[in-house]
UniProtKB/Swiss-Prot annotation:
Its cofactor is coenzyme F430. It is found in: Cytoplasm. It is an enzyme of class 2 (transferase). Belongs to the methyl-coenzyme M reductase beta subunit family. It comes from Methanothermobacter thermautotrophicus (strain ATCC 29096 / DSM 1053 / JCM 10044 / NBRC 100330 / Delta H) (Methanobacterium thermoautotrophicum). The lineage of its organism: Archaea, Methanobacteriati, Methanobacteriota, Methanomada group, Methanobacteria. This is Methyl-coenzyme M reductase I subunit beta. It catalyses: coenzyme B + methyl-coenzyme M = methane + coenzyme M-coenzyme B heterodisulfide. Pathway: One-carbon metabolism; methyl-coenzyme M reduction; methane from methyl-coenzyme M: step 1/1. Coenzyme B binds at residue 369. InterPro entries: Me_CoM_Rdtase_asu/bsu_C (IPR008924), Me_CoM_Rdtase_asu_N_sub2 (IPR015823), Me_CoM_Rdtase_bsu (IPR003179), Me_CoM_Rdtase_bsu_C (IPR022679), Me_CoM_Rdtase_bsu_N (IPR022680), Me_CoM_Rdtase_Fd-like_fold (IPR009024). Keywords: Cytoplasm, Methanogenesis, Transferase. Binds 2 coenzyme F430 non-covalently per MCR complex. Coenzyme F430 is a yellow nickel porphinoid. Methyl-coenzyme-M reductase is activated when the enzyme-bound coenzyme F430 is reduced to the Ni(I) oxidation state. One of its GO terms (cellular component) is cytoplasm. NCBIfam families: met_CoM_red_bet (TIGR03257).
Length: 443
C-alpha cells in the first residue's frame, strides 16, 4: 500500500507524455529499480586510462605535478596489449565467472570501463573497493603481461594509482570514479553528494534535463542515506525529486517552453505562481492594496513547485546567457523574488537562498576560487540546501557554451569518455521514468 496519495504524470526530455497517474513512491530511491541501478552503478564503476598509464611510464612522470623520476622510464605497449591486460584484470576482479563484473575496452584500447562485482560490496563497509580493487588488478596484469621486474613494479603502481598512500587522494592516478574518496566527506551520508557537477554534466553529455535528473537522483538519494528523507520529511524530498529533477507533470518543460524565447527569472515566477493557483497548490489568503498574500495547505507540494520553477528559471537565464557563471545569482534572486511575490517560503525553506549567498561569493567576488562546475553537494559552500541547489548548477553547466575555465571538458574528460557509455548514467530520466511506469501497479 502506498504511503502517499500523490500521483504524477511522467514525461521524457522532449516533453512527450510517457505514463500517467504514477504513484509518487514509484520514483523513490527505495523502490525505483533504475535509481537503485544508477546508484549501485556509480559505486561500482571505474574509468581506467590505459593510454595515460603508458605515457606516465614512458616519461616516468608519476604521482602528480612536478614528479618526474629520471632513469625510471618504462617503454611498455599497454594500449597495444590492452585486450590481454583487460582479460587478466577481469579474472582478478571477478568473484565468480557469471557475476556482474564488467571490463570493457573503449577508444581502441586507450580506455577501460570497469564495473566491480556487487559481491565485493556485500562485504565492504563503503565504496573504496571499486578504485582499489581495479587499480590493484590492473597493476598486476601489467606487471605480468610485460614481466616487469620487482625493482620496476613500484613505477607501475604509481602510474596506475598515483602518489597514494603518501597522499590522501589518488594524486596523479590514471583511474577515475565519480565518487570522491571517503576522507573528503563533510559528514556521514554525504558520499553521493560528493560528486563534482562537471562529472554529472560530462556523463550526461551536456543534455540539460538529463544532467538535472542525474544530479537530483544523487542529491535526493543521499537524503535517504543521511536520514533527512524520513517520516514527516520523506514526501517533501520525493516531491522535490519528482518535480524539480524528473519534470513531473511536465512543469519544468512547460515553464521553459513558455519563457525560453523572451522570458526572464521574473516571468518564470509569474507563470509558476499562476500554475500553482490553477492546480490548487496555493490560494490567495489576503488581499492588500495592489498586493496579494498567498497561503497553502501543502507546504511540501509548494516547495516542489517552487523548486521546479527554480530549475526552469535557471535554464531560461543561463540558457539565454549561454553561460553558467550567473547560476548563483539565479538561485539567490529567484527565491528573493518569489518570497516577495507570494509571502510563501522560497525553495527548501530559505536554504537555497542562503546557499546562493555564499556560492556567489566563492564563485565570483573577492575570492572567486572556482567556477560553478567544480562545486558539489558536499562542498562547505553548497552543502546547506538538502538536494535542491546543485541540480540547478548541473543544468547551468550543461547549458554553458564554453565560457568556463573549469569546464566539464577540462575537469572530467575521462569521466565523459567512460561513464557516458553506460546508458543509465547518460539518460537517467528515460530509465527512471520507464522503471516507474513498470512498477506503478505494485505501489
Amino acid at each position: 500500500m502506498a504511503k502517499f496519495e500523490d500521483k504524477v504524470d511522467l514525461y521524457d526530455d522532449r516533453g512527450n507524455l510517457v505514463e500517467e497517474q504514477v504513484p509518487l513512491e514509484a520514483l523513490s530511491p527505495l523502490r525505483n529499480p533504475a535509481i537503485k541501478s544508477i546508484v549501485q552503478g556509480i559505486k561500482r564503476t571505474v574509468a581506467v586510462n590505459l593510454e595515460g598509464i603508458e605515457n606516465a611510464l614512458k616519461t616516468a612522470k608519476v604521482g602528480g605535478p612536478a614528479c618526474k623520476i629520471m632513469g625510471r622510464e618504462l617503454d611498455l605497449d599497454i594500449v597495444g596489449n590492452a585486450e590481454s591486460i583487460a582479460a587478466a584484470a577481469k579474472e582478478m576482479i571477478q568473484v565468480t565467472e557469471d557475476d556482474d563484473t564488467k571490463v570493457e575496452l573503449l577508444g581502441g584500447g586507450k580506455r577501460a570501463l570497469v564495473q566491480v562485482p556487487s559481491a565485493r560490496f556485500d562485504v565492504a563497509a563503503e565504496y573504496s573497493a571499486a578504485p582499489l580493487v581495479t587499480a590493484t588488478a590492473f597493476v598486476q596484469a601489467i606487471i605480468n603481461e610485460f614481466d616487469v621486474s620487482m625493482y620496476d613494479a613500484n613505477m607501475v603502481k604509481a602510474a596506475v594509482l598515483g602518489r597514494y598512500p603518501q597522499s590522501v587522494e589518488y594524486m596523479g592516478a590514471n583511474i577515475a570514479t565519480m565518487l570522491d574518496i571517503p576522507q573528503k566527506l563533510e559528514g556521514p551520508g554525504y558520499a553521493l553528494r560528493n560528486i563534482m557537477v562537471n562529472h554529472v554534466v560530462a556523463a550526461t553529455l551536456k543534455n540539460t534535463l538529463q544532467a538535472a535528473a542525474l544530479s537530483t537522483i544523487l542529491e535526493q538519494t543521499a537524503m535517504f542515506e543521511m536520514g533527512d528523507a524520513v517520516g514527516a520529511f520523506e514526501r517533501m524530498h520525493l516531491l522535490g525529486l519528482a518535480y524539480q529533477g524528473m519534470n513531473a507533470d511536465n512543469l519544468v518543460f512547460d515553464l521553459v517552453k513558455a519563457n525560453g524565447k523572451e522570458g526572464t527569472v521574473g516571468s518564470v515566477i509569474a507563470d509558476l505562481v499562476e500554475r500553482a493557483l490553477e492546480d490548487g497548490v496555493i490560494k490567495v489568503e489576503k488581499e492588500l492594496t495592489d498586493y496579494k498574500v498567498y497561503g497553502t495547505d501543502d507546504l511540501a507540494m509548494w516547495n516542489a513547485y517552487a523548486a521546479a520553477g527554480l530549475m526552469a528559471a535557471t535554464m531560461v537565464n543561463q540558457g539565454a546567457a549561454r553561460a553558467a557563471q550567473g547560476v548563483s545569482s539565479t538561485l539567490l534572486y529567484y527565491n528573493d523574488l518569489i518570497e516577495f511575490e507570494t509571502g510563501l517560503p522560497g525553495v527548501d525553506f530559505g536554504k537555497v537562498e542562503g546557499t546562493a549567498v555564499g556560492f556567489s561569493f566563492f564563485s565570483h567576488s573577492i575570492y572567486g576560487g572556482g567556477g560553478p562546475g567544480i562545486f558539489n553537494g558536499n562542498h562547505i559552500v553548497t552543502r546547506h540546501s538538502k538536494g535542491f541547489a546543485i541540480p540547478c548548477v548541473a543544468a547551468a553547466m550543461a547549458l554553458d557554451a564554453g565560457t568556463q575555465m573549469f569546464s566539464p571538458e577540462a575537469t572530467s574528460g575521462l569521466i565523459k569518455e567512460v561513464f557516458s557509455q553506460v546508458d543509465e548514467f547518460r539518460e537517467p530520466l528515460k530509465y527512471v521514468v520507464e522503471a516507474a511506469a513498470e512498477i506503478k501497479n505494485e505501489i
